[in-house]
């Protein structure tokens, strides 16, 4: 296909559970990408984790050939995108490789906040957005209401939105037919020098770095020498090809196409995502606009349970960072937990997924400390520093002002649940900025402290609205706030990994709850264990795990009271000595207890 008019590059924008992976499965079936024997549900979600949780985490690409009713055969390059708020950067990368996007909306539930945010990203990048109403076979489908919502919330014309049901296959052909007419063909010159954008890369132990690319201009084939623009290094191409979704080698990749390039790059940072590839003999080709780097919003310490695993842990993180460019990490040491890494994540789900991937794919046992956000600290000498670890907070005497990150949150919620959602936002110290009543739903915009949002806000929002509310948030600014560091002392010793930065008003309550929670989780020892919560030098809460005690009087039958007293005194002295030298084992659950404290 030397002519680009046959190519259509598109991705699907949809909220979690609105059926985009199922729709992708139908496309693959109809275009004969896989035989019936190889077909399985959620065929693009290749990670076990994605299947179990029913969410898409990574962007995947598939090239399909579709014979349309006008007699032409089109090459469809479809890039799957995640729908969860934590993986927005994956979406913007996928969209950079497309000319159009399908906005898939559940005809029963209507528009969700996350789809709105991704849809705006697509429109900003100049993509043609085509609305599709899915799950039309369900009795609760209300196509007219949902069309109205798409028009009033997102502002795109939805009068001729295609209605389909990905599960039953109804209307999927109409979606494909509309797609080839609505979405424009890519622009590009096959004869021009090579320009290819790296959308994604991952590390294969046998092949080295595998890069998923969108070719803008030119062509690339096996044996070509390619230049990575950011590193200036030259590599020889071992193979190029496409996913159908099987790994299929082709003779070359041309302008407008999406496929993979393997060039035997062994250095993990050899082909960064968002970089431009060109041929060695045309090194002065312009760099394509990449993606903006996303800043992590949540930081947590990850430590291997056994210190022997530290090197393996570092290798695993390096390989994972290649595949997930938003993960950041730096070495950290803790008195309580030894050596590990301070990692930055986009949100709590991202953190859970990374931890699970490390444990599953790389067979590591890890302990995670409580996540925190980044605080801006203005010191008395005028210097501004950023702190992502409570134990690194400078002495309070040297701090002029502490500022916490505020995010702008957009919440879409049905009218019936509006009261509960507003109560939750007020409890989380939110300030209402705006409210729009739409047909059936209300859009509320709040400024909320990031600290309150990242921990459990998403879960609480879902439970107070019975799962109907949806949330999208983005960092807005830093704002001065009355913050303090809450330390946890066990037997008079501070445990650095348990420190938290909290708002002063919430501190006594948080401290009490944390201490009670720790009391349940720390196993009883042979001596009393005192658990205290402190702000600076002031203890604000205390609890004691009572000692186990052996009945030393069991062998005295009757007898003199002084004999009994002697045995009890001896036991007491032994316990006192033990308390001075004994150390308390803190289980992993205790570190996570910090999360479970309802603020």
UniProtKB/Swiss-Prot annotation:
UniProt cross-references to PROSITE patterns, sorted A to Z: G_TR_2
Family: Belongs to the TRAFAC class translation factor GTPase superfamily. Classic translation factor GTPase family. LepA subfamily.
Pfam families tied to this protein: EFG_C, GTP_EFTU, GTP_EFTU_D2, LepA_C
Protein name per Swiss-Prot or TrEMBL: Elongation factor 4
Function description: Required for accurate and efficient protein synthesis under certain stress conditions. May act as a fidelity factor of the translation reaction, by catalyzing a one-codon backward translocation of tRNAs on improperly translocated ribosomes. Back-translocation proceeds from a post-translocation (POST) complex to a pre-translocation (PRE) complex, thus giving elongation factor G a second chance to translocate the tRNAs correctly. Binds to ribosomes in a GTP-dependent manner.
GO CC annotations on file: plasma membrane
Membrane-related topology note: Peripheral membrane protein
EC number: 3.6.5.n1
One MF annotation (Gene Ontology) recorded for this entry: GTPase activity
GO biological process: positive regulation of translation
HAMAP family membership: LepA (MF_00071)
Binding site residues for GTP: 17-22, 134-137
């Amino acid at each position: 296909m030397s002519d680009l008019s046959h190519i259509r590059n598109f991705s699907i924008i949809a909220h979690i559970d609105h059926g985009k992976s199922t729709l992708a499965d139908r496309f693959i079936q109809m275009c004969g990408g896989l035989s019936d024997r190889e077909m399985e549900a959620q065929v693009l979600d290749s990670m076990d984790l994605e299947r179990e949780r029913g969410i898409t985490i990574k962007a995947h690409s598939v090239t399909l050939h579709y014979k349309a009713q006008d007699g032409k055969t089109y090459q469809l390059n479809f890039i799957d995108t995640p729908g969860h708020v934590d993986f927005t950067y994956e979406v913007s990368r996928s969209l950079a490789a497309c000319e159009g996007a399908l906005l898939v909306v559940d005809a029963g539930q209507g528009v969700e906040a996350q789809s709105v945010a991704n849809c705006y990203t697509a429109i900003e990048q100049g993509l043609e957005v085509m609305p599709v109403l899915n799950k039309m076979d369900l009795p609760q489908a209300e196509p007219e209401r949902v069309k109205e919502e798409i028009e009033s919330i997102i502002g795109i014309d939805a009068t001729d939105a295609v209605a389909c049901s990905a599960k039953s296959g109804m209307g999927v052909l109409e979606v494909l037919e509309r797609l080839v007419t609505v979405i424009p063909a890519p622009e590009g010159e096959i004869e021009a020098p090579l320009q290819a954008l790296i959308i994604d890369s991952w590390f294969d132990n046998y092949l080295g770095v595998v890069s998923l690319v969108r070719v803008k201009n030119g062509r690339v084939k096996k044996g070509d020498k390619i230049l990575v623009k950011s590193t200036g290094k030259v590599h020889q191409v071992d193979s190029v090809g496409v996913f159908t979704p099987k790994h299929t080698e082709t003779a070359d990749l041309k302008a407008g196409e999406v496929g993979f390039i393997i060039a035997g790059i062994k250095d993990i940072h050899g082909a960064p995502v968002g970089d431009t590839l060109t041929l060695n003999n045309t090194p002065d080709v312009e760099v394509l606009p990449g993606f903006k780097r996303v800043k992590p919003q949540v930081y947590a310490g990850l430590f291997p349970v056994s210190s022997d695993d530290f090197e393996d842990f570092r290798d695993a993180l390096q390989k994972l960072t290649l595949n997930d460019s938003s993960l950041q990490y730096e070495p950290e040491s803790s008195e309580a937990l030894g050596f590990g890494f301070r990692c930055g994540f986009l949100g709590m789900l991202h953190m859970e997924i990374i931890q699970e991937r490390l444990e599953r794919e790389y067979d590591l046992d890890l302990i995670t400390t409580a996540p925190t956000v980044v605080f801006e600290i203005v010191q008395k000498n005028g210097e501004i520093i950023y702190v992502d670890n409570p134990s690194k907070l400078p002495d309070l005497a040297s701090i002029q002002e502490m500022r916490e990150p505020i995010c702008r949150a957009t919440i879409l919620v049905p009218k019936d649940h509006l009261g509960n959602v507003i109560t939750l936002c007020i409890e989380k110290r939110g300030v209402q900025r705006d409210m729009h009543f739409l047909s059936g739903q209300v859009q509320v915009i709040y400024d909320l402290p990031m600290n309150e949002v990242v921990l459990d806000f998403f879960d609480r929002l879902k439970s107070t609205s019975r799962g109907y509310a949806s949330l999208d948030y983005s960092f807005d600014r830093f704002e001065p706030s009355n913050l303090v560091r809450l330390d946890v002392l066990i037997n008079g010793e501070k445990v650095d990994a348990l420190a938290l930065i909290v708002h002063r008003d919430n501190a006594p309550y948080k401290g009490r709850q944390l201490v009670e929670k720790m009391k349940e989780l720390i196993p009883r020892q042979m001596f009393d264990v005192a658990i205290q919560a402190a702000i600076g030098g002031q203890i604000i809460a205390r609890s004691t795990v009572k000692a186990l005690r052996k009945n030393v009087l069991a062998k005295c039958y009757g007898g003199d009271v002084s004999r009994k007293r002697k045995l009890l005194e001896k036991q007491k002295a032994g316990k006192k000595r033990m308390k001075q030298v004994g150390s308390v084992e803190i289980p992993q659950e205790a570190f996570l207890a910090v999360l479970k404290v309802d603020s």
